[in-house]
């Protein structure tokens, strides 16, 4: 499809098509999420960008996501207070775009991500309540895929087997041709 200018964005240009003369802001700016409940449900955020507008909140910042389309895409909204990188469409401060997030300190990095030794490949997704998914290239029992709930229930799939725990003592292990329930209380070969 051919790109069509947004008719609601006439503020970017005069009626004759000439660019408006106002301060332009190019590049990325540090911001903070003030509101993540978008009334239009489009993944927009209200942010504060001190280097551009001081303490005044921006208009709704459009998301820049890796995949988006009709009934498909990736949605991951940061919490209020999170650090976000903000750009401005054609440099116009009235049209912010949130393009990603950053951690303000090492204490903010998800705990599951810290379980992977530095230098080894892993991808971690973790919610604020500690529900998480880790995909790791670590060899053996510490690698593979791990789903973990906030209460400790886990599902681990790796080269050594499949391990399911409910976080309350029950466990199911599938290793080779053997199924073990509750640490050997029942073994099926």
PLM features: residue spans?
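Hydrophobic packing positions characteristic
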Residues: 7, 11-174, 189
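Divalent metal-coordination and catalytic microenvironments
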Residues: 181
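Short, low-complexity, Pro/Ser/Thr/Gly-rich segments in the mature regions of secreted, periplasmic
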Residues: 184-188
């Amino acid at each position: 499809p051919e790109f069509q200018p947004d008719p609601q964005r006439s503020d970017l240009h005069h009626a004759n098509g000439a660019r408006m003369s106002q301060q332009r802001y190019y590049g990325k700016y540090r911001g903070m999420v003030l509101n993540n409940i978008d009334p239009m449900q489009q993944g927009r955020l209200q942010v504060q960008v001190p280097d551009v507008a001081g303490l005044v909140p921006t208009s709704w910042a459009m998301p820049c996501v890796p995949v988006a389309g009709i009934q498909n895409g990736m949605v991951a909204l940061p919490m209020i207070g999170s650090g976000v990188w903000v750009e401005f469409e054609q440099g116009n401060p009235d049209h912010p775009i949130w393009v990603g997030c950053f951690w303000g300190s090492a204490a903010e990095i998800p705990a599951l991500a810290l379980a992977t030794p530095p230098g080894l490949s892993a991808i971690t997704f973790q919610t604020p309540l500690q529900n998480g998914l880790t995909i790791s290239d670590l060899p053996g029992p510490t690698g593979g895929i791990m789903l973990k709930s906030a209460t400790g229930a886990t599902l681990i799939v790796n080269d050594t087997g499949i391990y399911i725990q409910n976080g309350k003592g029950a466990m199911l292990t599938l290793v080779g041709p053997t199924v073990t329930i509750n640490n050997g209380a029942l073994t099926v070969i």
